[in-house]
Amino acid sequence: MPYTSNPAKIQRTPNTQNSGVNQPPVFEPITPIKVSERWFPKDRRFGLYECGGRVAPNVTSILGWKFPFDKAKWKKSEPNIDHDAVTRESAKRGTAVHLAMEKWLQSHGHAPVEEHLQWINPLQSLVSRASKTLAVEVPLHHSIHGVGAYAGSCDGVMLVNDDVVLIDYKTKRHGKEVLPKFCEQQRLQLAAYSLAISHLYKDQLPAPVTRTSLLFAHPEDGKPVTVVSTQGNLLLEYQQKWLDLLGEWYEVHGDQVAYEQNNFDEQLKLSTW
């Protein structure tokens, strides 16, 4: 029977020292593959990464094509807010929280601004329970035979007991709840990453990825992180959904990717003359 997931409310019982500061899990990182920085070709609605001479669209661009953001619907549902300001603040907060978690997991010194601690502290309390950190911001660039390639970067790969788990950080505004039925896009994103990481790093990981977890941090004091996990048969279903979507995307955009590949090859030739 397929595994079904409800948002698990994980109460915080942090792994701490006498200082009261959350201590990160043991850091035993895998060696990442070399992938270029992302760039956006002119007049394209997708970004590209390059690895080994091959270009590949980023996962978030593919998902953005499948799940276009409906700003008009958002404005109708929340008419009394400054939508542009909320968007800017959300992006700023997300960048700050991701950077803080990245530095913390690697035990690098970093002092986030105080206003973001209400999201950072609960995430650190939860993630500190993991057995090991295997990767932070791990790059991926993966080709599916007969379909096409895709690329991206995953927030973290953790060992939780004997399970290899992908994690992705999300931050919510005050008063916002999380429902798994509205996490389709994010679950597909991690399903794509799980397929790629299990293949690309199979010789370095203790096992294939068996679970993906979306970690939604809330700013309300004392409110636990909401975890939406996908595993077992449900993860297999989402992996297949991703492969189907990837095929659909390449049917529409495959010629454009081929054109950009040719451009890249030509530029590479010119640079080596």
Name the predicted role of every residue range:
Residues M1-P2, Q17, S143-G146, L205, ...:
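Accessory terminal regions of nucleic-acid processing enzymes
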Residues P2-A151, L270-W273:
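Metal-dependent nuclease catalytic cores that hydrolyze phosphodiester bonds in DNA/RNA
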Residues E28, R88, S107, Q118, ...:
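Polar/charged alpha-helical tracts
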Residues G47, Q106, P112, V127, ...:
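Amphipathic alpha-helical interaction segments
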Residues G109-E115, T226-V228, N263:
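General "foldedness" signal
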Residues V138-H253:
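Mg2+/Mn2+-dependent nuclease catalytic core
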